[in-house]
Amino acid sequence: MARALADLSVNLQVPRVVPSPDSDSDTDLEDPSPRRSAGGLHRSQVIHSGHFMVSSPHSDSLTRRRDQEGPVGLADFGPRSIDPTLTHLFECLSLAYSGKLVSPKWKNFKGLKLLCRDKIRLNNAIWRAWYIQYVQRRKSPVCGFVTPLQGSEADEHRKPEAVILEGNYWKRRIEVVMREYHKWRIYYKKRLRKSSREGDFLAPKQVEGGWPPPERWCEQLFSSVVPVLLGGSEEEPGGRQLLDLDCFLSDISDTLFTMTQPSPSSLQLPPEDAYVGNADMIQPDLTPLQPSLDDFMEISDFFTNYRPPQTPTSSNYIESPSFGPMADSLFSSGILAPEMPSPASSSSSSGMTPHSGNTRLQARNSCSGPLDPNPFLSSEFLLPEDPKTKIPPAPGPTPLLPFPTPVKVHGLEPCTPSPFPTMAPPPSLLPEESLLSARFPFTSAPPAPGVSTLPAPTTFVPTPQPGPGPVPFSVDHLPHGYLEPVFGPHFTVPQGMQPRCKPSSPSPGGQKASPPTLASATASPTATATARDNNPCLTQLLRAAKPEQALEPPTMPGTLLRPPESPQDTVSEIPRARAFFPPIPAPTPPRPPPGPATLAPPRSLVVPKAERLSPPASSGSERRLSGDLNSIQPSGALSVHLSPPQTVLSRGRVDNNKMENRRITHISAEQKRRFNIKLGFDTLHGLVSTLSAQPSLKVSKATTLQKTAEYILMLQQERAAMQEEAQQLRDEIEELNAAINLCQQQLPATGVPITHQRFDQMRDMFDDYVRTRTLHNWKFWVFSILIRPLFESFNGMVSTASLHSLRQTSLAWLEQYCSLPALRPTVLNSLRQLSTSTSILTDPSLVPEQATRAVTEGTLGRPL
């Protein structure tokens, strides 16, 4: 099939496409054919940053035909005028965006009939203007940009047409996005089928060894964008049925919406970023730069709650059948099952006490991968520096854990020789017991000052070492509870002791390989090395170990025999072993029953019976481990029982609970903080009038804070204005009170003595006169309000006893009440009463009715 298609493509003669005369392209001879790049005629174009690209934007002849009204004639193919200055396009830009722009992202100019080429040119001009303004720091002559937080200028771009055209009010749904995406996916298939129907096979040639060039790929994707979207007259009537998604997308693996699913985060993308990844939106954005607090919490949780992988790690040696797999329930329940004695040990000797109480532990390793034997810390701090006390070599097989001469401890007195002779065990028991001793490497730790002497319960025949030099010591499975006090950050290997390791090699014949051994130092005594620098694996164990694996150190009875030929070494040996374990007094366990005596060679190996301690019933996670203590007995029978410090390391579960509580507290505090922030922003939305007026509009937090600050500033200005106005009113009140007091001081001390009956009669006569005149003209009632204070003062001051008194009191009344300084406050009070008792200020048309009602209802002189 491929050969036939290739022959078809070779045999078909495709004429060269020449630009038509009606092409108003602003570039030189751009060929829209997708076979342009194959012929080598395509010129490389310089693409700057932010260049919106479509391969053939000038091949939209179908769009021009659709825009033209009426049939297409020969006269329509004449030359057209080209506008190289972009004047018409900038007019369209000014029409769509009358204010300033906010972002240089792609704009479709909805509502304007623009060609695809013109939209690209406009968007390139907009992007270039943004580049000139913000990168080159120059003023762009085309258009300007503003940020939402630039004060009064921020409202310039908030015009309705700009907001709608920018897409802030688009109802974007995932179905719309998927539909647009599917349109882009079916362009190539539709063009391929159309070309195959016309007999022109336009399938792109397969480029061997990688993708085709970018220009060719873009041409293949975008060469027929506009015809496919709009569908012209050249398309077949049934061609739209080929756009069936089931038909076109059946063999296309749609991975866009599975790869771009947003991660569960509190920072949701704004609506403007819903089209990230669309073919139109090829501009870079700032979405990857938005921080996520949840990611930071996950990273912090990784450091606080990190657990090493529980995958089984390969060891440096093959375990023997005696080390069977032990279930994890041994650690979870806290109960250690004692090992049953082997048949060889149970039936070998008559009357000897077999080493049947040993507890086998299969410690889990926290270090991923096999442990490198080289960086392990040497156990030479337990070896004396005196080379004379070292064990001389002897031929024969070697046990896994022969102990050197014990170190000196504070308060250790020389012990008396043991009254019990040594015993020789059967040979079949020694390898298993040695292996069991090697599995627990803590027996050589220096004991506490409290030391008690015990007779040796069990003694074995020593197995000499095969050669001079190293003393084997297994540190393969080291519980993490012992690592922290020994290998601290400030721990330094004592001078004269350098850790050296010999990697073990597997023994031939299918036998198990020996674990890595530690040799005694033979180098210069001035060499000093820190445990952290020489121990990368132990450092990893310290940093990444589980808290649950921190086990309690065992409390073990042991028997260490010392050579009688050097009694002075008992007190003069190195006391620096106290630096590794603090001198905590430990209780002395009960004496084991001594077994029957059996003669043995003078230099023998003593393996005491290890006691198993049951865990306390209150905590199932605390585990007490017991181990074996092997030591070399020189030619002498000094028996000393040493007990290591009993430090109960039960911090595993406590630290775990504390860490979990801290994590929960941190999460709850973070949730509370976020809820308070959200509640605060919701409160601001309700308080600020500009935000509460449009509750459906989604506003960013920065805009919310800016609007809130502006609203607070406005409230402060209004409050200052109100306070200033209130102060002015207070000043006016004080001035009025002062004027009133001044007027009152000018009144006479005693008024004219008149009868009360005469005063009431004059008032009734005045009311009757006012009523009569008001019914004829309502304005007289307003005049009566102004003249009533003068009438009251005249009625109270003028005396009619005689003409002389009438003249005198009338002149006095005129001077006192009718002068201009006296009339002003009186008229002012009358006008105030008129304004408060009637609606002359709010609705003057109601004043005649109110005046008539006042004189008819007898409310003259009183507020309505």
Swiss-Prot record:
InterPro entries (UniProt xref): bHLH_dom (IPR011598), HLH_DNA-bd_sf (IPR036638), Max-like/E-box_TFs (IPR052207)
Localization annotation: Nucleus
Stored Pfam families: HLH
Record-linked SMART domains: HLH
Signal sequence, renumbered to the chain: none
Modified residues (Phosphothreonine): T27
Keywords recorded for this protein, A-Z: DNA-binding, Nucleus, Phosphoprotein, Repressor, Transcription, Transcription regulation
UniProt feature, compositional bias: Pro residues: 583-596
Chain spans, region Disordered: 15-41, 53-77, 332-397, 449-468, 489-533, 547-570, 583-602
GO biological process: energy homeostasis; fatty acid homeostasis; glucose homeostasis; glucose mediated signaling pathway; lipid biosynthetic process; negative regulation of DNA-templated transcription; negative regulation of oxidative phosphorylation; negative regulation of signal transduction by p53 class mediator
Single GO MF descriptor: RNA polymerase II-specific DNA-binding transcription factor binding
GO CC list: chromatin; cytoplasm; cytosol; nucleoplasm; nucleus; transcription regulator complex
Record has Hydrolase as a keyword: no
Predominant subcellular localization, coarse grouping: nucleus
Domain bHLH intervals: 661-715
Amino acid composition bias (Polar residues), ranges on this chain: 351-368
Post-translation changes: Phosphorylation at Ser-566 by AMPK inactivates the DNA-binding activity.
Residue ranges of the region described as Leucine-zipper: 715-736
Modification Phosphoserine occurs at: S20, S23, S25, S196, S566, S614, S626, S643
Tissue specificity comment: Expressed in the ventricular and intermediate zones of the developing spinal cord of 12.5 dpc embryos. In later embryos expressed in a variety of tissues.
Low complexity bias locations: 513-531
Protein function: Transcriptional repressor. Binds to the canonical and non-canonical E box sequences 5'-CACGTG-3'.
Known partners and oligomeric status: Binds DNA as a heterodimer with TCFL4/MLX.
Protein name as it appears in the record: Carbohydrate-responsive element-binding protein
